[in-house]
Amino acid sequence: MDVRQSIHSAHAKTLDTQGLRNEFLVEKVFVADEYTMVYSHIDRIIVGGIMPITKTVSVGGEVGKQLGVSYFLERRELGVINIGGAGTITVDGQCYEIGHRDALYVGKGAKEVVFASIDTATPAKFYYNCAPAHTTYPTKKVTPDEVSPVTLGDNLTSNRRTINKYFVPDVLETCQLSMGLTELAPGNLWNTMPCHTHERRMEVYFYFNMDDDACVFHMMGQPQETRHIVMHNEQAVISPSWSIHSGVGTKAYTFIWGMVGENQVFDDMDHVAVKDLR
């Protein structure tokens, strides 16, 4: 488990390129036949990836010890979106088939969660966010047909994109975790511009569906003290509440966003005008 401490905005603005990457970038999300796990002190979110190829991968008691509990989800909820080939997730003996861009919400109290790929030639890639939970909501599969999509932006401003809301109150109940998948239309490069912060929630972006020769310049920092982190395919970045979170790519891309914090009101944002950015 890679533990990341919280960081003050006054400290963050003094960091060089490597310093920013050390604090906020999750460089390697998927490793064959293993789970990766980054624990952030910011709202206690855990992010990572699971890519089973030659064997199943379970997340259970061994993680619980690191969290000071008996098992991983004793006091947590889990959200998973599969960006790879078809797979399965077995939760306490109940098997769910999770296809490409299907998702699974796992409620607090699940003792054993086992991940598998159906075809080793096209393994599943399970990206997950995990947050503290105060009660148990039912485990539920969500397919792309069941999400709440919103299309925003314009080709003229190069920010036309569809926001697919997987884990939001309109789709299912969670304690605090919200997750979704945003896909840019071909030829569009910008996400979340004009940008915003949300003082009441933190967020993690996971960029994927990118060519090897492409990158995204992820914008972060306070609106008057912006910085950037160069992101490549299948990398994630942690965004504190005080930071903007926007990006521009050399080509179109897709990203998964996950939020935890005070509320689940998607539109609870502190908008920042482009003219006010520095």
Curated annotation (Swiss-Prot):
InterPro entries in alphabetical order: KduI, KduI/IolB_isomerase, KduI_N, RmlC-like_jellyroll, RmlC_Cupin_sf
GO terms under biological process: D-galacturonate catabolic process; D-glucuronate catabolic process; pectin catabolic process
Binding site for Zn(2+): H196, H198, E203, H245
Keyword Metal-binding: yes
Documented EC number(s): 5.3.1.17
Cofactor: Zn(2+)
Top enzyme category: isomerase
Function: Catalyzes the isomerization of 5-dehydro-4-deoxy-D-glucuronate to 3-deoxy-D-glycero-2,5-hexodiulosonate.
Record's protein name: 4-deoxy-L-threo-5-hexosulose-uronate ketol-isomerase
Lineage of the species this protein comes from: Bacteria, Pseudomonadati, Pseudomonadota, Gammaproteobacteria, Enterobacterales
Gene label: kduI
